Amino acid sequence: MQKLLLIAATSATILSSSLSFAEGMDNEWYLRIDTGAAMFNEEKDKATGVKLKSNTTVPVDLGIGYYISENCRADLTLGTIIGGKLKKSGAATNAPFTGTNVSASHKPTITRLLINGYVDLTNFDMFDVFAGAGVGPALVKEKITYNGITGLSSNTKNRTNISYKLTLGTSAQIADGVKVELAYSWIDDGRTKSKNVIYPGTSVPTGGMRYQSHNLTAGIRFDI
C-alpha cells in the first residue's frame, strides 16, 4: 500500500508538472466517470492446466483531467473492476491431478491509478475521434478456488505492478461543458503473485495469473 501511495504522489506531481505548460491558456479542468463491460484474455490455471475463460466484468473509473490544448488533454484516473472472474471446468492436464475433473476459478481484485494522455485524430461537426495511452501503478491480487480437488484453494497477497492502457474512442458534446465518450481500451495489469500450496506429498504452484482485458466503456466529462 505504501508503494501505491508513493507512486500515486509521483504520478500526481508529473501530471501537475505537465499541465504547467498550459498556464495562461483559456482551458478548463474536467471530472470524468466511465463504466462499461470488459473481458479478460484466456489463461491457463497453473496448478491443473485447465484453460480458463472470462465472464463479463464491469470496469469503473473516476478521474480528473485538463484540456492542455484544443486537441490534447490529460487526466489522472482511479479504476477498479466489479465481478471479474476467470473460470472453467474440465479435466486437469497437470500432474498430480491429470485426468481429474475439476472446476477452477480465479477472482481478481484490481485497483489501478493511471496517468492518461489523449489526442484528437479527427474533428467533425458532431463528434471527435481520439487515441490515448495511460500508465501507472496497479494493485493486483486474486482468490483461487477449486471444486473437485480438496485443499488446493488459496488467496494471493497484493502485488504492485505497472499497468498499461491503450485507447481508441469517439466523443461528442451534448451540452455546454458536458461531453460523452464511447471507447475501446486494452489494459495490461500484470501478474498476480505466485504461491506454492502443499498438497499431500507435493508442492503445487498456484497464482501467477496475468490479467489483460478488452474494455468497451461509455463515459461522461464535466467541465469544472
From Swiss-Prot:
Q: Which InterPro entries match?
A: OMP/PagP_b-brl (IPR011250), OmpA-like_TM_dom (IPR000498)
Protein name per its UniProtKB record? Putative adhesin RMA_1308
| Organism taxonomic ancestry | Bacteria, Pseudomonadati, Pseudomonadota, Alphaproteobacteria, Rickettsiales
Q: Which Pfam families match?
A: OmpA_membrane
Does this UniProt record's set of keywords contain Transcription? no
Keywords attached to this Swiss-Prot or TrEMBL record, sorted alphabetically, are:
Signal
What do the Gene Ontology cellular component annotations say?
A: cell outer membrane
- Signal sequence range: 1-22
Q: Which organism is it from?
A: Rickettsia massiliae (strain Mtu5)
